[in-house]
Regions:
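Conserved C-terminal structural/oligomerization subdomain of aldehyde/semialdehyde dehydrogenase
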Residues: 2-4, 17-20, 24, 343-522
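ALDH superfamily catalytic-core signature
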Residues: 5, 9-12, 20-28, 188-189, ...
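Residue-level signal for inorganic ion chemistry
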Residues: 56, 101, 163, 194, ...
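Alpha-helical structural signal in soluble globular domains
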Residues: 64-66, 77, 98-100, 104-105, ...
Length: 522
């Protein structure tokens, strides 16, 4: 082991950093001091990046143990921050994080390892080529609140195992749970590897204004995402933006209506509708419409009040439902209830205007617009009228699902980064699955293999022999002729010379002759 490797392993064995590091003391520093410290650190390769990948993966194993032991404490803080039930906090926040850590322990070495590059042209004789992967450097993560432990935790796992320094701006809506998570992560890390700011909005604005990063990861609304993109564009800082998804569940004629209604409604009401990949509208084939509505209505009627993150969120989703009903939609519950503080009873509205805020998904709560379409093409066309595509679900027969799941043109037409068949939201928890938005839903990949690769950068490396190497300078005419024959360039030049101005080979028929029909052979 090298001296550097031994020093890193010694550092990894140290007791955890004091909790003040990266928190209160960092907040007390002035903007100028922060810029100076950031600049000094950027001038050197950080020691965590110098740690062998095997050492960083071993740290993941110890992190997994700490998260598992601290699961109940994390659940307490999640419930206090955002009001989830204990089961939902455990199943949708803590468990996916533990599964992701386990997956990265098994697969990070493969994803992050470089290797030789095949396909060297013959004229590059004496050269060897490979691609190496190194950390991007210093990563800023601006965290969100709806899955405060799962989303931030996975993003930190990927940035840290790739060897980066990380600075986190916690969400102002989830300060307790994310502070607890950060303290679990900071154990055993070299000092300065993981820092965090205050959780208020001013801290987020100052983070990008006063400091420079090599990559910024943001999860949140499209409006704020645009602001982050504009700020980072001034310094050409790469970003990963995981923004709003207002997607569709497409129910085809051969779908099991009871299964579709149950699966879609479960996704709509999960986490009180505060899931960016949850469906905001169900587009139902007219032939399946009566059975689907019949199956969905009792599920809507049986739903109890959901707790949203704020009174404003509850009021907004209730307003969208009222407007959809006023525009001609039919509430499947029969009445539209007013919110009670942060609590509101989930609702679904059948029919109505395609341009309503409910149909467009202009809310973040447990409400569903149910729209009709005639067949698959019309369903996809209606889905594409809405511009935010993150995760689409398609409900159909098992045989049709198998065929459509392999139809690349159909998958591309849906426009989303994730397509699920006969399920919604839950399959996206697979730790190898990446989330990649397009257009108003963001850009760049987070989670999965693509998200992990995004936390590193490629370096193309070549070594040329000092003895066997391609001669420099322009070769003689005879050597150039041999070169053309060996590379096929001579044949290509003759072929191009035989084409007319339109890029087609001239006909052998006499000029002006009419094309003749082919004579059938007896």
């Amino acid at each position: 082991m090298s001296a550097d490797g031994a020093a890193i392993q010694s550092e990894l064995a140290r007791p955890p950093c004091p909790t003040g590091v990266g928190t209160a003391s960092a907040q007390a520093d002035g903007a100028a001091a922060a810029r100076g410290a950031s600049g000094a650190l950027r001038m050197q390769v950080h020691e965590w990046a110098e740690a062998p990948l095997a050492a960083r993966i071993a740290w993941l194993g110890r992190l997994q143990d700490r998260v598992a032991r601290g699961a109940e404490a994390l659940v307490d803080e999640i419930c206090a921050d955002v009001g989830k039930s204990r089961w939902e906090a455990l199943a949708t926040d803590v468990l996916p994080l533990v599964d992701s850590i386990r997956w990265h322990r098994r697969h990070a070495a493969r994803v992050l390892s470089g290797g030789p590059v095949a396909g060297r042209p013959w004229w590059m004789v004496g050269m060897s080529h490979r691609v190496d992967r190194v950390p991007v450097g210093h990563v800023a993560i601006i965290a969100t609140w709806n899955y405060p432990v799962q989303l931030l935790g996975i993003q930190m796992v990927q940035a840290l195992v790739a060897g980066n320094r990380v600075t986190v701006k916690p969400s102002e809506r989830a300060p307790r749970s994310q502070r607890a998570l950060l303290e679990l992560f900071s154990g055993e890390l070299p000092r300065g590897t993981l820092e965090w700011t205050a959780s208020d909005r001013a801290a987020g604005e100052a983070l990008l204004r006063d400091r420079r990063f090599d990559h910024v990861v943001f999860t949140g609304s499209t409006e704020v995402g645009r602001s982050v993109a504009e700020t980072c564009a001034r310094t050409l800082t790469p970003t990963t933006l995981e923004l709003s998804g207002c997607d569709s569940a497409i129910v085809l004629a051969d779908a099991d209506p009871a299964l579709a209604a149950r699966g879609i409604w479960e996704a709509v009401t999960m986490n009180a509708g505060q899931t960016c990949m949850a469906p905001r509208r169900a587009i139902v084939d007219a032939r399946a419409w009566p059975r689907f509505i019949e199956a969905l209505a009792p599920l809507v009627g049986a739903s109890g009040p959901a707790r949203l993150v704020s009174e404003q969120s509850a009021a907004r989703v209730a307003e969208c439902v009222r407007d959809a009903v006023a525009g001609g939609g039919r509430p499947l519950r029969g009445v539209v209830e007013a919110p009670s503080g942060v609590h509101w009873r989930p609702a679904a509205v059948a029919g109505g205007s395609l341009m309503s805020d409910l149909a467009r998904g202009a809310h973040f709560g447990p409400a569903l617009a149910v729209l009709a379409a005639d067949g698959l093409e019309a369903s996809v066309a209606l889905h594409r009228r809405f511009d935010q595509h993150l995760a689409v679900s398609v409900w159909c027969s098992a045989a049709r699902a198998r065929a459509m799941s392999r139809d690349r043109s159909m998958l591309a037409a849906l426009g989303a980064g994730v397509v699920t068949f006969n399920d919604a939201v839950r399959p996206t928890a697979h730790p190898a699955t990446s989330i990649a938005g397009r257009g108003p839903s963001g850009w760049g990949a987070s989670r999965g293999e693509a998200g992990l690769r995004a936390m590193s950068r490629d370096i193309g490396v070549s070594c040329t022999s000092t003895r066997l190497r391609t001669p420099s300078g322009e070769p003689t005419a005879s050597v150039q002729s041999i070169f053309r024959r060996l590379t096929g360039l001579g044949r290509a030049r003759r072929a191009v010379a035989g084409l007319d101005s339109r890029g087609t080979r001239p006909s052998a028929d006499p000029a002006g002759s009419e094309p003749r029909a082919r004579t059938p052979q007896p």
